[in-house]
Amino acid sequence: MLYQFIFHTLLRRVDAERAHRVSFAGLRALAAVPGTTRLMRRVLGPREPELRVRVFGREFPGPLGLAAGFDKNARGVAALTALGFSHVEIGTVTGQPQPGNPRPRLFRLVADRAIVNRMGFNNEGSQAVSERLRAHRARRARDLIVGVNIGKTKVVPDSDAVADYVTSARRFADLADYLVVNVSSPNTPGLRDLQATERLRPLLSAVRRTLDEAGRPDLPLLVKIAPDLADEDIDAVADLAVELGLDGIIATNTTVSRDGLATDPEEVAALGAGGLSGAPLKERALQVLRRLRARVGDRLVLIAVGGIETPEDAWARIRAGATLVQGYTGLIYGGPLWPRRIHRGVAALARRDGFASIAEAVGVDVDPSAKPSTASS
């Protein structure tokens, strides 16, 4: 495959962050050519009827979206959707602009098909990013599905964390198709402490109240959690999300664990701190998803992310309770045709297993009472 040849002979030798910046700029330049995004969406986008799923009051053409972290500043939403993603989650965006952590801060573990990052929420801030997204909406109406992932500004003290999130929520209230409160990145000191329910409750309540005051009580609100939470903490967050009337949970963010890696331990240690994404996260992310589905059933929309590489991975997440799935590292290693391969593969797996729609398959491996549609057999 051409991309694999380019990756292994060229891209892997280039600093990971620089490679990302150059390739993303190239994609945006291509998408700027009149008619290109329309053609790309027609060729690469999900078209199989089995893939359509209605979530958050919108019809998603397929389950696979781009996870937060790739397009932090809403610079390439149209271009990324044209690659075949059903939705793009921008961010993480913070209340104030910030440069993130010192470079280098993004590393590939090729032997593990993984990435270690300690980017530190580098972004232009919610004021600038919301203005860019507003301009995009003015040009394209709301034909693209865009989620917004918000986090805490590093220099903001913990005592002002809620106000920082609220600032971003207010700015994106009329622009986002769904809003994600990110309390699970390992790269902002103290951020994961916000996952404790006694701190998460006032935060989520304040964000929900802000959306109500902004005239968007219907804006879907989700929380993104870490894979490193203990089982009882996962249950506590799930229960809180149901209690507060949230719309969903994204499971999971990156992990701080380095267990079971094929890369030499000394090489891994030399990279330093950061969140690990990619194939090594697969099993734990699936475990967390299963636990969430068993806890909340269909009361919340679950979005699965972490270690999804193949159609089989995505299909397993859907059967375990995910209505939508997301990827980032899979795109880096799989190349620009990766979204199309995932969507086509999932459609084939749905047909193989007797489902007329992927919506019928959500949670069937956790809820034995669910069965394929007889009309599809």
From Swiss-Prot:
Presence of the UniProt keyword Flavoprotein in the record: yes
Pathway(s) this gene product operates in, as recorded in its UniProt entry: Pyrimidine metabolism; UMP biosynthesis via de novo pathway; orotate from (S)-dihydroorotate (quinone route): step 1/1
Residues the record lists as binding FMN: 68-72, 92, 149, 182, 224, 252, 278, 307, 328-329
EC number: 1.3.5.2
GO MF terms, alphabetically ordered: dihydroorotate dehydrogenase (quinone) activity
Record Pfam families: DHO_dh
Catalytic activity: (S)-dihydroorotate + a quinone = orotate + a quinol
A single BP term in Gene Ontology: 'de novo' UMP biosynthetic process
The record's free-text note on cofactor binding: Binds 1 FMN per subunit.
GO cellular component: cytoplasm; plasma membrane
Entry keyword set: Cell membrane, Flavoprotein, FMN, Membrane, Oxidoreductase, Pyrimidine biosynthesis
Binding-site list for substrate: 72, 117-121, 182, 187, 253-254
NCBIfam families: PRK05286.1-2, PRK05286.2-1, PRK05286.2-5, pyrD_sub2
Sequence similarity: Belongs to the dihydroorotate dehydrogenase family. Type 2 subfamily.
Function, in words: Catalyzes the conversion of dihydroorotate to orotate with quinone as electron acceptor.
Name the record gives this protein: Dihydroorotate dehydrogenase (quinone)
Gene: pyrD
